[in-house]
Regions:
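Transmembrane alpha-helices and adjacent helix-loop boundaries
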Residues: 1-303
Length: 303
């Protein structure tokens, strides 16, 4: 684990030196946010087996709450962040209170419905959100106005969240979550309150997505509902699946690959969508454990 953290710190330190143009440094910031989002969703689907298709809603809640507090009400950004995290986490718990007793496709439909409702609220509650017109002129956090500083901030937060979650899943809490994922009935027979622990994972995942959302508006400078449509939720899920859900490093790998792959394929125009889709299909069909499974197989072959 120490080796992984050291490698991550080295990559974070060197990446902006290798990718010095504003465009690529912007991609690095997006990648760091995507790592946060993938980690947040992996806690829910990878460790408790809950099929959540509404994670983009919590990303949006963090973005809008922090922006409305800072831009409309004049709050300090660093005071708005914990409020935005709490708002996303509490709404995640509220949804979980109704949804955790659902399983499989029913939970997927319920979470998808929540994402659609959130999206419609952002469009139609114009007095607060400005609707489809959006909110403009949003600045990055104070002290992190240039791209390099913002990247190091978001990447540092992503590393911190990784360490917290890694310790969590290695603890008895992680064992409890995995027991629920493998067999909820057997877990209940051991005295585990599955609904309570699933709600905990759902709420914590929502809070982390809300944290990622706090940094998105300052990066792009604008905030519009279209940035949080259902495609965003499916993109997060693709990152987790491609990297390897139920592992800690898998979602990080998936986020990096699926952030940079579309950019590297941009030179082939519309064909990039075909290549991108084909790559995803091949991973799902032949490596159900994701790229982590491929890495493990290569290590075994070498040994």
């Amino acid at each position: 684990m120490k080796l992984r953290v050291a490698a991550a710190v080295l990559v974070i330190a060197l990446a902006p030196l290798l990718l010095q143009t504003p465009y690529w440094r912007g991609i690095l910031i997006v990648c760091a946010m995507n790592v946060l989002l993938a980690l947040s969703l992996n806690l829910v689907i990878g460790y408790t087996g809950q099929l959540n298709l509404g994670q983009a809603a919590f990303f949006a809640i963090g973005a809008y709450v922090s922006t409305i507090l800072t831009k409309t009400h004049g709050w300090n950004f660093w005071l708005a962040v914990p409020v935005a995290i709490a708002a996303a986490g509490l709404l995640g718990l509220a949804l979980a209170a109704f949804a955790v007793r659902l399983r499989g496709h029913y939970l997927a439909i319920a979470s998808l419905g929540f994402a659609v409702i959130t999206y419609q609220v952002l469009i139609n509650w114009e007095r607060v959100t400005e609707g489809v017109r959006g909110i403009y002129g949003i600045l990055p956090p104070p002290g992190f106005r240039d791209q390099l500083a913002l990247f190091y901030l978001v990447a540092g937060i992503a590393v911190a969240v990784y360490l917290v979650l890694d310790n969590l899943v290695r603890s008895p809490v992680g064992e409890t979550l995995r027991a629920i994922r493998e067999d909820e009935v057997s877990a209940a027979s051991l005295g585990i309150n599955a609904a309570r622990w699933k709600a905990f994972a759902f709420g914590l995942g929502a809070a982390i997505a809300g944290l990622a959302g706090c940094f998105y508006p300052g990066f792009v400078g604008t905030l519009v509902p279209e940035a949080f449509n259902i495609v965003e939720s499916f993109t997060m899920m693709a990152m987790v699946i491609v990297g390897g859900m139920g592992t800690m490093i898998g979602p990080v790998i998936g986020a990096v690959v699926l952030t940079f792959l579309p950019e590297l394929l941009r030179s082939i125009g519309e064909l990039r969508l075909l290549v991108y889709g084909l790559a995803l299909t091949l991973v799902v069909l032949f490596m159900p454990g994701g790229l982590v499974q491929l890495g493990a197989a290569l290590r075994r072959k070498r040994s």
